[in-house]
């Protein structure tokens, strides 16, 4: 096996997704240790990143979610320290974390994305409701794990929802409702893995359904996708990742309309690795166990 040296599993951090990161990090740490890797937990909230060098770490497995973890900040710090790390580089991480600018790139390249609008204090909210229709989704562009996502169903409600969300960093976007199903497709080293059909017991795949409930149904392989649709989803996932320069292990989320058309929703450049997480479920269908998946991701560690 490749010699990775002393490995820091970067987990925790400062974002609203701290607890999820700690869960993912603990699972990864145990998996790496089970494979004989000299791995240790490292929480930047508790210990400055500059200590990585002082403590002799040679590789970083980054599983820091959200702000400062997957937005290019920690990636830049690791570049300066010269420590190889897993996941995408600075630019791809920053773009992937920004749903608005990621959508602009996908649109420019002709990839299918749901119609959306950016909201501001002076937005004509009635016009946006008329344009996108109801229901619609409103979300912060720079949050993950469905933090701050609201389904707007009532006419005249858009402005008040915007007021509730505008304290979040970055743009607030409204998005047309696509009602044919939710899906996700991991990409590892430029190869699309089996897609997953997500059937939440809640109204949509929100934070509660992702992390706190056990009644969300995950179909992998998806029972309602044809072979052609599955192939297209994998192709679109790979193209979506390549469009922003994402590397290593990523996950692209999709919506399917009632007419069967697939839309790219967003990309996660540092997907979760908890017991509820989607990438391990997809890898398992390919015959790759959790510990082996962690090793494959660790092999992608890089600088530059």
UniProtKB/Swiss-Prot annotation:
It is found in: Cytoplasm. Keywords: ATP-binding, Cell shape, Cell wall biogenesis/degradation, Cytoplasm, Ligase, Magnesium, Manganese, Metal-binding, Nucleotide-binding, Peptidoglycan synthesis. Its cofactor is Mg(2+); Mn(2+). InterPro entries: ATP-grasp, ATP_grasp_subdomain_1, D-Ala_lig_Van_CS, D_ala_D_ala, Dala_Dala_lig_C, Dala_Dala_lig_N, PreATP-grasp_dom_sf. Residues 103-299 form the ATP-grasp domain. ATP binds at residues 129-184. Its EC number is 6.3.2.4. Binds 2 magnesium or manganese ions per subunit. Belongs to the D-alanine--D-alanine ligase family. Cell wall formation. This is D-alanine--D-alanine ligase. It comes from Neisseria meningitidis serogroup A / serotype 4A (strain DSM 15465 / Z2491). The gene is ddl.
């Amino acid at each position: 096996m490749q010699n990775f040296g002393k490995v820091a599993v970067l987990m925790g951090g400062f974002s609203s997704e701290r607890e999820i990161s700690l869960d993912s990090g603990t699972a990864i740490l145990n998996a790496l240790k089970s494979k004989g890797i000299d791995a240790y937990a490292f929480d930047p909230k508790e210990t400055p990143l500059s200590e990585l060098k002082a403590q002799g770490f040679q590789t970083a497995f980054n599983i820091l979610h959200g702000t400062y973890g997957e937005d290019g900040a920690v990636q830049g710090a690791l570049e300066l320290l010269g420590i190889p790390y897993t996941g995408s580089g600075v630019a791809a991480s920053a773009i992937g974390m920004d749903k608005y600018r990621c959508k602009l790139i996908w649109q420019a390249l002709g990839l299918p994305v749901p119609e959306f609008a950016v909201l501001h204090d002076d937005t004509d909210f009635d016009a946006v409701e008329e344009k996108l229709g109801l229901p619609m989704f409103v979300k912060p562009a720079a949050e993950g794990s469905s933090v701050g996502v609201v389904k707007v169903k009532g006419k005249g409600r858009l402005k008040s929802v915007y007021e509730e969300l505008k304290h979040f960093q970055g743009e607030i976007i409204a998005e047309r409702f696509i009602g044919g199903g939710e899906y996700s497709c991991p990409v590892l080293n430029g190869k699309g893995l089996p897609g997953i059909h997500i059937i939440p017991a809640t109204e949509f795949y929100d934070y509660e359904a992702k992390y706190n409930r056990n009644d969300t149904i995950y179909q992998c392989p998806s029972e309602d996708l044809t072979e052609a649709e599955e192939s297209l989803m994998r192709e679109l996932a790979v193209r979506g990742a390549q469009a922003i320069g994402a590397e290593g292990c990523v996950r692209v989320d999709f919506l399917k309309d009632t007419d069967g058309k697939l839309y790219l929703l967003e990309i996660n450049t540092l997907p979760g690795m908890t017991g509820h997480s989607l990438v391990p479920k997809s890898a398992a269908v390919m015959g790759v166990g959790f510990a082996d998946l962690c090793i494959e991701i660790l092999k992608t560690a890089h600088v530059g």
